[in-house]
């Protein structure tokens, strides 16, 4: 979904929980507390059915949130939602501060280096450490994984749908080694 979409992808329904229709929603960002702040979500099932759903109750756990959704009354109802993508309404969220971005707005941006050379497109965001990592892919190129920090991502232009990347040295060293036929240890 684009930056102008009324929704931001939050995560997915990981599994049914219990017998009374609860579902476990796993956020793409494990540290996200967004679900605690909204009363409704937008759900897109694997079959492509989309609908708004109201949250009736939420119980956080270390890996996911256990949620009661309006109209989901049984385990069968809950199992029908497993694998569904979960979105939040942009209008229900506080706008990001100056220089900050919703992670979902970064996915789909074209990535270029400081000289404007195409590196690929931001396809995913991995949140495995203190800062998220942008996963940049392009046909015929190795995948780039770049920390989303000012040092490596000096410019984000949502209007132009473009992000400027300064890859970490180890990535550049690996690319030089690959171009010369050797591995990173052969790079200067």
Swiss-Prot record:
The keyword rRNA processing applies. Residues 98-171 form the PRC barrel domain. Keywords: Chaperone, Cytoplasm, Ribosome biogenesis, rRNA processing. GO terms for biological process: ribosomal small subunit biogenesis; rRNA processing. The keyword Chaperone applies. InterPro entries: PRC_barrel-like_sf, PRC_RimM, RimM, RimM_N, RimM_N_sf, Transl_B-barrel_sf. One of its GO terms (cellular component) is ribosome. SUPFAM superfamilies: PRC-barrel domain, Translation proteins. This is Ribosome maturation factor RimM. It comes from Myxococcus xanthus (strain DK1622). The lineage of its organism: Bacteria, Pseudomonadati, Myxococcota, Myxococcia, Myxococcales.
């Amino acid at each position: 979904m684009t930056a102008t979409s009324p929704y931001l992808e939050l995560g997915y329904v990981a599994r049914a929980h219990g017998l009374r229709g609860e579902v476990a929603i796993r956020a793409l960002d494990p540290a996200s507390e967004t679900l605690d702040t909204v009363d409704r979500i937008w759900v897109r099932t694997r079959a492509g059915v989309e609908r708004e759903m109201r949250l009736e109750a939420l119980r956080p756990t270390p890996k996911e949130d256990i949620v009661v959704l309006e109209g989901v009354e049984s385990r069968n109802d809950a199992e029908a939602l497993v694998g569904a993508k979960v979105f939040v309404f942009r209008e229900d969220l506080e706008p990001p501060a100056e220089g900050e971005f919703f992670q979902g707005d970064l996915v789909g941006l074209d990535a270029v280096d400081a000289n404007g050379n195409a590196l690929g497109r931001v396809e995913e965001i991995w949140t495995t450490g203190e800062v998220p990592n942008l996963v940049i892919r392009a046909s015929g190129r190795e995948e780039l994984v770049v920390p989303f920090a000012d040092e490596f991502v000096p410019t984000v232009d949502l209007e132009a749908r473009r992000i400027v990347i300064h890859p970490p040295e180890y990535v550049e060293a690996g690319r030089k080694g690959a171009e010369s036929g050797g591995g990173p240890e052969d790079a200067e």
